[in-house]
């Protein structure tokens, strides 16, 4: 069981699709996220990612993962994990679809942005464009805009949990 300190955010992190395409982030792209303070990351990657998690951790980004949850075939447990998150970051996968369906504030990224800030059928999903040649731009945008993202997440959350106590600084 994850225990968060007061003011910490739980961010669910999915960095790639199962088919591994240009819509994905690479493990090394995630390293700058370690600059975010008062954040706990939870891997919500729905396939075997244990070796990638070792790589992520070796880059200095602590991330939790529940090995006892089959995030691909046990939808109810996956939804419980996603529902516990204050924010989810994911490419265009089932993870973002489930989080959006649950009303969890979600940053969805894709190489082809739909050219509207929010997806009409998922009002708690904000879409950001991923430049496959420069994925660091997306990560830097998330890091630099985290206070605004928190404000947006508080405005759209349907969980009733507000994360305005976040005290992280860059």
Language-model segments: residues:
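Catalytic machinery of carbohydrate-active enzymes
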Residues: 1-170
């Amino acid at each position: 069981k994850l225990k968060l300190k007061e003011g910490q955010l739980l961010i669910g992190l999915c960095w790639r699709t199962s088919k591994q395409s240009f819509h994905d982030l690479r493990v090394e792209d995630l390293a700058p996220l370690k600059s975010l303070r008062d954040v706990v990351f939870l891997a919500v990657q729905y396939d075997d990612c244990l070796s990638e998690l070792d790589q992520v951790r070796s880059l200095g980004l602590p991330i939790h993962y529940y090995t006892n949850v089959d995030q691909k075939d046990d939808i109810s447990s996956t939804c419980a994990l996603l529902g516990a998150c204050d924010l989810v970051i994911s490419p265009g996968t089932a993870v973002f679809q489930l989080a959006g369906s649950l009303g969890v504030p979600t940053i969805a990224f894709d190489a082809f942005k739909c050219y509207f800030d929010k997806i009409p059928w998922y009002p708690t999903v904000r879409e950001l464009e991923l430049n496959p040649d420069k994925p660091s731009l997306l990560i830097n945008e998330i890091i630099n805009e985290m206070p605004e993202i928190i404000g947006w997440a508080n405005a759209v959350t349907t969980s009733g949990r507000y994360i305005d106590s976040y005290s992280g600084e860059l």
